């Protein structure tokens, strides 16, 4: 690599790292990644716009003899990942932080060779597309981490400097500790709807909403989806029709059959498209607990895609759908509950407990263990819905 090119890499790395020095908040993965054993390379994948680049720069800032580089930089297009890493190692760098590694076609082969040579440690990020997770030949060399979209807690801390700490699901299940948590976070409990509307990403989605989010959706479809399957204009049109239909409907209303009828494609095509849309981070699928006679999932969006699509269509998102989707995006679920007839319900299994999601008038007609209600009430088996946004 020419000296002037690498000099530019150094200058850009220093400027980028300096740009995050003032950021006091960190994504939830930061401390875990700091403790990672250097015996392995580290990969972080996740949806666009949720803080992967800032996370990588913060790690570089706190690591000695480190260099940051964006793999999609145009001036580096003639150099492979191996070329860049080899030059960094030759100049005494011990840690290389590579952003957007999925934009390089031969990145897995380069990482394999670099790991086996053992001259430099690498941490890298990529989109949520499946090609970032595919590297089977890297399984002995790389520890992969998914960076989830920011939780309500992280949204409040990053945007409003709330200083909110994580809570455990077991603390919410205990009435005494739940009371203390609810009182402590009372002023933040009404923010879940703002978070639902535009808080699942960290770029400034609130300004000119929903345009920034719709632009992100377009890029995810045309770039990320194209990296996991072949697409053409017809498939892109089918994807948009599916997304619009899902956005306007409740998760309990959607099925593979009615989506196939609406779009005009086979059920198999719908199933494959839905799975691919989950891989690239647009959808979140929640399957029935213990299967049942049909294992068809509930179809949720990652936040804030449903609200953006609906607002672009001049529609309001149903509040019941918003509550469920907020819950599904913030809680590690074991699955949703079906009735004996196979009807989808707003009940979810979380750590062995049944939790029913609803509004202030929700009654315990399903005999759930707990009610996640859109209120501040924490008495008995009621848990304020917003508190489920503080789990990570």
Predicted features and spans:
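Short glycine-rich substrate-engagement loop in P-loop NTPases that contacts/grips substrate
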Residues: 64-95
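Pre-Walker A adenine-sensing motif
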Residues: 17-36
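Interdomain motor-coupling "hinge/lid" segment immediately C-terminal to the ATP-binding subdomain
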Residues: 2-6, 127, 133-237, 243
